[in-house]
UniProtKB/Swiss-Prot annotation:
Binding-site residues, chlorophyll a ChlzD2: 119
Annotated gene: psbD
Residues reported in the UniProt entry to bind chlorophyll a PD2: 199
Residues with Phosphothreonine modification: 2
Protein name: Photosystem II D2 protein
Amino acid sequence: MTISIEKSVKKTQPSLFDLCDDWLKRDRFVFVGWSGLLLFPCAYLALGGWFTGTTFVTSWYSHGLASSYLEGCNFLTAAVSTPPNSMGHSLLLLWGPEAQGDFTRWCQLGGLWTFVALHGAFALIGFMLRQFEIARAVKLRPYNAIAFSAPIAVFVSVFLIYPLGQSGWFFAPSFGVAGIFRFILFFQGFHNWTLNPFHMMGVAGVLGAALLCAIHGATVENTLFEDGDGANTFRAFNPTQSEETYSMVTANRFWSQIFGIAFSNKRWLHFFMLFVPVTGLWMSAIGVLGLALNLRAYDFVSQEIRAAEDPEFETFYTKNILLNEGIRAWMAAQDQPHENLVFPEEVLPRGNAL
């Protein structure tokens, strides 16, 4: 007689973390993931705060301006404005000592701006982490997430680091089209931003990337060699086809004839298209960090002194300085009325050209 003894196998219950991990990473129409716990709530709150502010909230108490659709603004002039200078770097929490739980007072004090700025920054970081997470799940390299770090760096440097280096959130850009244009004028007038090499690298990166994208797209279209049956390019090819339908060799020969030099392989070509805009944006973010600390490395004082002493001496730099002084004299009184600024003669617009 044979007796079989079956060992009792104790089934281990999945932990709460495993259950959450399984649910978050489940295959669905919109991937959630752990990064989604940061991305979706923060993006929802940031966008909701912006729509609420531009629709209903005035900037009368912080800037002396109308800034909402309710007051008659349009899409270009509506904005969620920065808090007043008197608030300094307060986080302006709804339950904090400034608003004390009063939502109307919180909006009047610019609380929506800090709300949108902080939730917006965390939403962008969550989106970058989302790209990391999905790339890891499908075994891709993380270059998409690395590339997205560049616009995050620009956002954080302009909206958070720059005002932290100044006297308060007041000096950050407001969240609106005209508000950001005003901030650009402010940057030029008070920091001579267009002469800053870091700004120049940023412009070269963005415009260079646009040029590279245009050249790359046109070259691929020009070297298609397997025409499909569709009426146009968009319907001619199956998006899941395995084979390529354009010729890298033909493209290489074409640009070799145009410039005498061309990319020899796709890896170097696409890395360069990644490198140009990402490096440019990171350099501009570093430049804004310098402005936050009020660095004056690119003020050519010797030319300014000579232009002041010699009526016949003028350079493109001194012409720009003259315009900057006009911007300062015009903006400061409007932009900072609480300071009651009185300008001495030497800082008012002067010079030979105007």
